[in-house]
Every structure is written in C-alpha cells, then in structure tokens.
Amino acid sequence: MAKEFGRPQRVAQEMQKEIAIILQREIKDPRLGMMTTVSGVEMSRDLAYAKVFVTFLNDKDEDAVKAGIKALQEASGFIRSLLGKAMRLRIVPELTFFYDNSLVEGMRMSNLVTNVVKHDEERRVNPDDNKED
C-alpha cells in the first residue's frame, strides 16, 4: 500500500509555508507591490525542481501579473538561498514560478452560477412575463 503523503508532498507543503513567509518579509521588489499568495507547490520526485504557483491580490491587469512573475523568477536565487537556511534539505530545489488563475476562474464560475440562480428565481416569481403569445 502506497503512503498517502510521500516525501515530495511533505516537502512541498513545508516549502509553500516557507516561501510565503519569505515573500511577505524579505522580498522588497516594487513590482510585487500587490499582495502575493503562494497557492501551491509541486515537487519533482527527486526534490530537485519545484513549481511554485502564486496568485496576486490585484491581478486584474495582465501586465502587472507578468511583471510580478518576472520579478519572482529574477528573485528565485535569493529565495532559494533563504529557503536553504530555513529548511534542512540536501539540495534546495530549483524554483519556477507560475501564475495560478484558479482563484479568478472559481470566482468567475461562482458569479455565473449566482446570475443563473437569480434569473431562475425571477422567472419563477413572474412566469407570465416570460410567455410569448
């Protein structure tokens, strides 16, 4: 029987917490003026590579998102060095940052469902308005 949480998953969870702390306290890049949240980390099986998924608080502007990802990618060496001090790993993984749009898509889907429910309620209250003669 396989373990439910293997070492890569445990390291990814700890790394997610540590990167969030580093981004909050140590990174002072003006391109990251918006609040940055680490939404997930995926580790390779050999723990040599990590995909870090981030979201930004004010992510309406696509150029700001691209600039934020670029800033994080440029700071990845610094983040790795701080991560090496915070975590006890033989090899600190190479970090690659990706924008996670699942939060934005989830909110969009929620708004669509809310609008459909609202429209359906209006049709139930006023059934005569929707009939055509």
From Swiss-Prot:
<dbReference type="GO" id="GO:0043024">
    <property type="term" value="F:ribosomal small subunit binding"/>
</dbReference>
<protein>
    <recommendedName>
        <fullName>Ribosome-binding factor A</fullName>
    </recommendedName>
</protein>
<comment type="similarity">
    <text>Belongs to the RbfA family.</text>
</comment>
<dbReference type="InterPro" id="IPR023799">
    <property type="entry name" value="RbfA_dom_sf"/>
</dbReference>
<dbReference type="GO" id="GO:0005829">
    <property type="term" value="C:cytosol"/>
</dbReference>
<dbReference type="InterPro" id="IPR015946">
    <property type="entry name" value="KH_dom-like_a/b"/>
</dbReference>
<dbReference type="InterPro" id="IPR000238">
    <property type="entry name" value="RbfA"/>
</dbReference>
<dbReference type="GO" id="GO:0030490">
    <property type="term" value="P:maturation of SSU-rRNA"/>
</dbReference>
<comment type="subunit">
    <text>Monomer. Binds 30S ribosomal subunits, but not 50S ribosomal subunits or 70S ribosomes.</text>
</comment>
<comment type="function">
    <text>One of several proteins that assist in the late maturation steps of the functional core of the 30S ribosomal subunit. Associates with free 30S ribosomal subunits (but not with 30S subunits that are part of 70S ribosomes or polysomes). Required for efficient processing of 16S rRNA. May interact with the 5'-terminal helix region of 16S rRNA.</text>
</comment>
<keyword id="KW-0963">Cytoplasm</keyword>
<dbReference type="InterPro" id="IPR020053">
    <property type="entry name" value="Ribosome-bd_factorA_CS"/>
</dbReference>
<dbReference type="Pfam" id="PF02033">
    <property type="entry name" value="RBFA"/>
</dbReference>
<keyword id="KW-0690">Ribosome biogenesis</keyword>
